[in-house]
């Protein structure tokens, strides 16, 4: 009987020493983690590490592309200079004229690439892809598009500058450099605006995209400067050499009419854009009447004159131009 009692106590003691249920015991959090949890946690760390490594790899690749673009531009400018003996190494000191000459060569390369890219705009739009195709056709590697950090706007701005220069050259020929008096200044203005808008015709389908790029805040100063400079040149060669308030109202009015006509032009489907040119002529006639009304209002003349004068000077400074047309 004593042995039975001892055995009974031993069984009770053994039960007390057995591990408690993991689901109900306070010691459950101290139990070892399942192997699947450890694997999942390890996999999560590996995934984060892989994402970080991918990010670093992308950034390093972009940095290499930028370096390659700079090197390509350097080699291209040396090639244009016949070996680049005057450019020197990056670490060597250079004088101001040498820097200007180097920048001029880079600008020439940019212009060459952008000229070639224009033929791809009807298919690619005003995009970086068009610039890449233009670079490849010009004999430069595709990574040279790094020379154009502004993207498609560089192409639009180049096109506008090129067209403006062509128009000014045409106006100079018609007026003998501004020396010959224009018989009908109003018709001269109408024909000048028409000639400028007709240059957009090959790119009419994608021109809304170009206008959107020009309207972006970071591009607005250059875009506005190109417009103000163009209307100033048109008015100058039309014979407008006055220094009164009309000098400003005519230029601002012409810029407004140009933009209105440009929007009408994009929606016009008439043969030869005949309705656009009728719209342009009507707006010009209205502008003449408005200018006559404003010329009779002397109260705000000086205020407007100071504001407009500052705007036109700023526009030419942005483009690196002056008022010397000789």
Swiss-Prot record:
Residue spans of biased composition, Basic and acidic residues class: 49-78
A GO cellular component annotation in the UniProt record: ubiquinone biosynthesis complex
Alphabetical list of InterPro entries matching this protein: COQ9_C, COQ9_HTH, Ubiq_biosynth_COQ9
Organism superkingdom: Eukaryota
Pathway: Cofactor biosynthesis; ubiquinone biosynthesis
A GO biological-process term: ubiquinone biosynthetic process
Molecular function per GO: lipid binding
Keyword Transmembrane helix: no
Localization per Swiss-Prot or TrEMBL: Mitochondrion
Primary residence: mitochondrion
Binding-site residues for a 1,2-diacylglycero-3-phosphoethanolamine, renumbered to this chain: 248-251
Alphabetical keyword list: Lipid-binding, Mitochondrion, Transit peptide, Ubiquinone biosynthesis
Transit peptide: 1-43
Positions of the UniProt region annotated as Disordered: 49-103
Keyword tRNA processing: no
Similarity annotation: Belongs to the COQ9 family.
Family annotation (PANTHER family): UBIQUINONE BIOSYNTHESIS PROTEIN COQ9, MITOCHONDRIAL (PTHR21427:SF19)
Purpose of the protein: Membrane-associated protein that warps the membrane surface to access and bind aromatic isoprenes with high specificity, including ubiquinone (CoQ) isoprene intermediates and presents them directly to Coq7, therefore facilitating the Coq7-mediated hydroxylase step. Participates in the biosynthesis of coenzyme Q, also named ubiquinone, an essential lipid-soluble electron transporter for aerobic cellular respiration.
Descriptive protein name: Ubiquinone biosynthesis protein COQ9, mitochondrial
Organism of this sequence: Drosophila melanogaster
Organism lineage: Eukaryota, Metazoa, Ecdysozoa, Arthropoda, Hexapoda
């Amino acid at each position: 009987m004593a042995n039975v009692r001892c055995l009974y106590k031993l069984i009770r003691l053994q039960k007390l020493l057995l591990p408690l249920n993991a689901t109900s015991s306070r010691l459950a959090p101290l139990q070892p983690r399942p192997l699947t949890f450890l694997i999942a946690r390890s996999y999560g760390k590996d995934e984060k590490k892989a994402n970080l490594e991918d990010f670093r790899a992308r950034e390093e690749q972009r940095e290499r592309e930028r370096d390659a673009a700079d090197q390509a531009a350097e080699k291209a400018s040396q090639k244009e200079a016949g070996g680049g003996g005057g450019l020197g190494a990056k670490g060597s000191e250079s004088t101001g004229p040498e820097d200007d000459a180097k920048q001029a060569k880079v600008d020439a390369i940019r212009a060459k690439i952008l000229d070639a890219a224009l033929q791809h705009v009807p298919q690619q739009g005003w995009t970086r892809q068009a610039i890449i195709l233009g670079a490849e056709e010009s004999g430069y590697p595709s990574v040279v598009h790094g020379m154009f950090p502004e993207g498609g706007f560089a192409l639009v701005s180049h096109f506008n500058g090129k067209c403006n220069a062509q128009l000014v050259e045409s106006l100079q020929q018609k007026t003998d450099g501004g020396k010959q008096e224009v018989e009908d200044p109003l018709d001269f203005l109408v024909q000048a605006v028409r000639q400028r808008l007709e240059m957009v015709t090959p790119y009419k389908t994608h021109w809304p995209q170009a206008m959107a790029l020009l309207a972006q805040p970071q591009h607005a100063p250059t875009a506005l400067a190109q417009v103000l400079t163009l209307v100033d040149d048109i008015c100058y060669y039309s014979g407008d050499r006055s220094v009164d308030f009309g000098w400003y109202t005519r230029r601002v009015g012409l810029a407004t009419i140009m933009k209105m006509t440009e929007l009408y032009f994009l929606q016009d489907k008439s043969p030869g854009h005949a309705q656009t040119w009728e719209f342009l002529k009507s707006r010009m006639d209205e502008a003449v009447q408005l200018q006559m009304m404003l010329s009779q209002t002397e109260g705000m003349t000086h205020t407007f004159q100071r504001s407009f004068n500052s705007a036109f000077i700023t526009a030419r400074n942005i483009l690196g131009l002056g008022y010397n047309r000789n």
